[in-house]
Amino acid sequence: MRRTNLASCLFVLVSATAGAQDPAVTDPDRYKVILENEHTRVLDYKDHPGDRTTQHKHPDSVLYALSPFKRKLTFPDGKSVIKAFNPGDVMFIPAQTHIGENIGKTDTHVLLVEFKKPPPSAKPVNP
């Protein structure tokens, strides 16, 4: 009984921590889920110059820029990268945890397509 309760508590704690890093949860004023199914989730992200997100994580994703913007991403190890985008830019982003900051003079507006991993039992489809 004691072992079951401990396992249940750990599961809840881990689940809460994992959910807390979902950008739609950590920054709901900026990230809007516009489509979600078993394969993908599409997020509409908007912010203003000087805005900074809470630390969050994304699975493998594709970013599509709808506006020009300049952004700083800071990773958990303290390293950071600065990227500038123009409307129509498309970029693959490997799974990562970061804090995002709009360091430019224009609003950010992007669509993020997040890829969900197939279940372990999924069989590849032949082309």
Enumerate the predicted regions with their spans.
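Conserved short histidine dyad/triad with adjacent acidic residue
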Residues: 41-57
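Bacterial N-terminal signal peptides
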Residues: 7-16
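Short acidic-glycine-tyrosine-enriched beta hairpin
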Residues: 78-95
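Local beta-strand/beta-hairpin segments that build beta-sheet-rich folds
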Residues: 25-35, 120-121
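Ligand-binding loop in jelly-roll beta-barrel domains
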Residues: 68, 95-118
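Short, conserved beta-strand element in jelly-roll/cupin
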Residues: 57-72
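Positively charged n-region of N-terminal signal peptides that target proteins for export
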Residues: 1-4
